[in-house]
Amino acid sequence: MASSVLSSAAVATRSNVAQANMVAPFTGLKSAASFPVSRKQNLDITSIASNGGRVQCMQVWPPINKKKYETLSYLPDLSQEQLLSEVEYLLKNGWVPCLEFETEHGFVYRENNKSPGYYDGRYWTMWKLPMFGCTDATQVLAEVEEAKKAYPQAWIRIIGFDNVRQVQCISFIAYKPEGY
Protein backbone atom coordinates (compact mmCIF):
# COMPACT_ATOMS: atom_id res chain seq x y z
CA MET A 1 0.00 0.00 0.00
CA ALA A 2 2.87 2.35 0.75
CA SER A 3 4.27 1.70 -2.70
CA SER A 4 0.98 2.72 -4.33
CA VAL A 5 0.93 6.02 -2.38
CA LEU A 6 4.52 6.71 -3.39
CA SER A 7 3.90 5.98 -7.04
CA SER A 8 0.79 8.22 -7.17
CA ALA A 9 2.78 11.09 -5.63
CA ALA A 10 5.48 10.61 -8.24
CA VAL A 11 2.88 10.64 -10.99
CA ALA A 12 1.32 13.83 -9.59
CA THR A 13 4.72 15.53 -9.53
CA ARG A 14 5.39 14.55 -13.12
CA SER A 15 2.03 15.80 -14.37
CA ASN A 16 2.58 19.17 -12.66
CA VAL A 17 5.88 19.58 -14.46
CA ALA A 18 4.27 18.67 -17.78
CA GLN A 19 1.41 21.12 -17.18
CA ALA A 20 3.79 23.95 -16.32
CA ASN A 21 5.58 23.47 -19.63
CA MET A 22 2.31 23.41 -21.57
CA VAL A 23 1.07 26.82 -20.34
CA ALA A 24 1.77 29.69 -22.72
CA PRO A 25 4.18 32.32 -21.44
CA PHE A 26 2.61 35.39 -19.80
CA THR A 27 2.55 38.49 -21.96
CA GLY A 28 1.84 41.61 -19.93
CA LEU A 29 1.48 45.24 -20.85
CA LYS A 30 5.20 45.61 -21.41
CA SER A 31 7.34 43.16 -23.30
CA ALA A 32 9.76 42.92 -20.37
CA ALA A 33 7.01 41.76 -18.01
CA SER A 34 7.55 38.40 -16.38
CA PHE A 35 5.24 36.31 -14.27
CA PRO A 36 5.54 35.61 -11.37
CA VAL A 37 7.92 38.31 -10.12
CA SER A 38 10.13 37.47 -7.19
CA ARG A 39 11.97 40.66 -6.38
CA LYS A 40 11.94 43.34 -3.73
CA GLN A 41 8.96 45.69 -3.86
CA ASN A 42 9.77 49.13 -5.14
CA LEU A 43 7.36 51.72 -3.75
CA ASP A 44 8.52 54.43 -6.14
CA ILE A 45 5.46 55.26 -8.29
CA THR A 46 7.60 56.14 -11.30
CA SER A 47 8.51 52.49 -11.72
CA ILE A 48 4.91 51.26 -11.98
CA ALA A 49 4.21 49.63 -15.32
CA SER A 50 2.44 52.00 -17.66
CA ASN A 51 0.90 51.44 -21.02
CA GLY A 52 0.46 55.16 -21.57
CA GLY A 53 2.51 55.19 -24.74
CA ARG A 54 0.00 52.93 -26.46
CA VAL A 55 -3.19 54.65 -25.31
CA GLN A 56 -4.87 57.22 -27.52
CA CYS A 57 -7.26 59.24 -25.40
CA MET A 58 -10.54 60.51 -26.78
CA GLN A 59 -12.04 63.76 -25.62
CA VAL A 60 -15.03 63.33 -23.34
CA TRP A 61 -18.32 64.77 -24.56
CA PRO A 62 -18.91 68.12 -22.79
CA PRO A 63 -22.22 67.97 -20.88
CA ILE A 64 -22.76 71.75 -20.70
CA ASN A 65 -25.23 73.03 -23.29
CA LYS A 66 -25.06 69.69 -25.11
CA LYS A 67 -28.28 67.78 -24.58
CA LYS A 68 -28.43 64.15 -25.64
CA TYR A 69 -31.18 63.48 -28.18
CA GLU A 70 -30.56 59.97 -29.51
CA THR A 71 -27.75 57.50 -29.89
CA LEU A 72 -24.81 59.24 -31.60
CA SER A 73 -26.41 62.63 -30.98
CA TYR A 74 -23.00 64.03 -30.07
CA LEU A 75 -22.11 63.95 -33.77
CA PRO A 76 -22.66 67.06 -35.90
CA ASP A 77 -26.06 67.51 -37.53
CA LEU A 78 -26.61 65.53 -40.71
CA SER A 79 -26.52 67.43 -43.99
CA GLN A 80 -29.22 66.96 -46.63
CA GLU A 81 -26.95 64.56 -48.54
CA GLN A 82 -26.27 62.54 -45.39
CA LEU A 83 -29.98 62.43 -44.55
CA LEU A 84 -30.70 61.24 -48.08
CA SER A 85 -28.04 58.55 -47.72
CA GLU A 86 -29.47 57.36 -44.38
CA VAL A 87 -32.99 57.17 -45.79
CA GLU A 88 -31.73 55.26 -48.85
CA TYR A 89 -30.03 52.80 -46.48
CA LEU A 90 -33.29 52.45 -44.57
CA LEU A 91 -35.23 51.74 -47.77
CA LYS A 92 -32.57 49.38 -49.13
CA ASN A 93 -33.00 47.20 -46.03
CA GLY A 94 -36.74 46.99 -46.62
CA TRP A 95 -37.70 49.04 -43.58
CA VAL A 96 -40.75 51.31 -43.54
CA PRO A 97 -39.88 55.00 -43.01
CA CYS A 98 -41.89 56.87 -40.42
CA LEU A 99 -41.58 60.43 -39.14
CA GLU A 100 -42.12 61.42 -35.54
CA PHE A 101 -41.93 64.80 -33.84
CA GLU A 102 -41.72 66.14 -30.29
CA THR A 103 -42.59 69.74 -29.42
CA GLU A 104 -41.44 69.94 -25.80
CA HIS A 105 -38.72 67.45 -24.87
CA GLY A 106 -36.64 66.28 -27.81
CA PHE A 107 -33.84 65.26 -25.50
CA VAL A 108 -33.57 62.30 -23.15
CA TYR A 109 -35.40 62.71 -19.85
CA ARG A 110 -37.29 60.49 -17.41
CA GLU A 111 -41.03 60.96 -16.96
CA ASN A 112 -42.85 57.64 -16.71
CA ASN A 113 -39.98 55.44 -15.60
CA LYS A 114 -37.24 56.50 -13.17
CA SER A 115 -34.97 53.48 -13.59
CA PRO A 116 -31.97 53.81 -15.91
CA GLY A 117 -31.92 51.85 -19.10
CA TYR A 118 -32.93 51.86 -22.72
CA TYR A 119 -36.50 52.98 -22.08
CA ASP A 120 -36.65 56.59 -20.94
CA GLY A 121 -40.40 57.15 -20.85
CA ARG A 122 -40.69 59.44 -23.87
CA TYR A 123 -43.43 59.26 -26.43
CA TRP A 124 -43.10 61.06 -29.75
CA THR A 125 -46.07 61.99 -31.92
CA MET A 126 -46.24 60.29 -35.29
CA TRP A 127 -46.27 62.58 -38.33
CA LYS A 128 -48.99 61.18 -40.57
CA LEU A 129 -48.98 57.42 -41.14
CA PRO A 130 -45.90 55.25 -41.72
CA MET A 131 -44.81 55.45 -45.36
CA PHE A 132 -45.64 51.88 -46.39
CA GLY A 133 -44.60 51.20 -49.98
CA CYS A 134 -42.25 54.19 -50.14
CA THR A 135 -39.27 53.52 -52.41
CA ASP A 136 -37.94 57.05 -52.93
CA ALA A 137 -35.81 58.75 -50.28
CA THR A 138 -36.74 62.20 -51.58
CA GLN A 139 -40.38 61.54 -50.64
CA VAL A 140 -39.30 61.05 -47.03
CA LEU A 141 -37.25 64.25 -47.04
CA ALA A 142 -40.21 66.12 -48.56
CA GLU A 143 -42.29 64.96 -45.59
CA VAL A 144 -39.55 66.19 -43.24
CA GLU A 145 -39.74 69.62 -44.89
CA GLU A 146 -43.53 69.62 -44.55
CA ALA A 147 -43.25 68.71 -40.85
CA LYS A 148 -40.68 71.49 -40.35
CA LYS A 149 -43.12 74.03 -41.79
CA ALA A 150 -45.97 72.80 -39.60
CA TYR A 151 -43.88 72.56 -36.40
CA PRO A 152 -40.79 74.79 -36.66
CA GLN A 153 -40.04 74.49 -32.92
CA ALA A 154 -40.20 70.68 -32.85
CA TRP A 155 -37.60 67.95 -33.02
CA ILE A 156 -38.21 65.65 -35.97
CA ARG A 157 -36.79 62.18 -36.30
CA ILE A 158 -36.92 59.48 -38.93
CA ILE A 159 -37.33 55.89 -37.86
CA GLY A 160 -37.10 52.70 -39.89
CA PHE A 161 -39.64 50.08 -38.92
CA ASP A 162 -39.25 46.43 -39.86
CA ASN A 163 -42.84 45.27 -40.35
CA VAL A 164 -41.83 41.58 -40.50
CA ARG A 165 -40.04 41.47 -37.16
CA GLN A 166 -42.20 44.34 -35.84
CA VAL A 167 -39.28 46.29 -34.42
CA GLN A 168 -37.75 49.71 -34.91
CA CYS A 169 -34.38 49.19 -36.60
CA ILE A 170 -33.06 52.72 -37.07
CA SER A 171 -33.80 56.12 -35.60
CA PHE A 172 -32.06 59.45 -36.06
CA ILE A 173 -32.78 63.14 -35.63
CA ALA A 174 -33.54 64.82 -38.95
CA TYR A 175 -34.25 68.32 -37.60
CA LYS A 176 -33.69 70.25 -34.37
CA PRO A 177 -35.19 73.66 -33.58
CA GLU A 178 -32.96 76.73 -33.62
CA GLY A 179 -30.74 76.98 -30.57
CA TYR A 180 -30.33 73.26 -29.95
UniProtKB/Swiss-Prot annotation:
Q: Which SMART domains match?
A: RuBisCO_small
Annotated signal sequence range = none
Give GO terms: molecular function aspect only.
Answer: ribulose-bisphosphate carboxylase activity
- Give one Pfam family, short name only: RuBisCO_small
Can you tell which superkingdom this protein's organism belongs to?
Eukaryota
Task: Look up the record and report any one GO term of the cellular component aspect.
Answer: chloroplast
| Single biological process term from Gene Ontology | defense response to virus
Family as reported in the entry's similarity comment: Belongs to the RuBisCO small chain family.
Q: What is this protein called?
A: Ribulose bisphosphate carboxylase small subunit, chloroplastic
What species does this protein belong to? Nicotiana tabacum
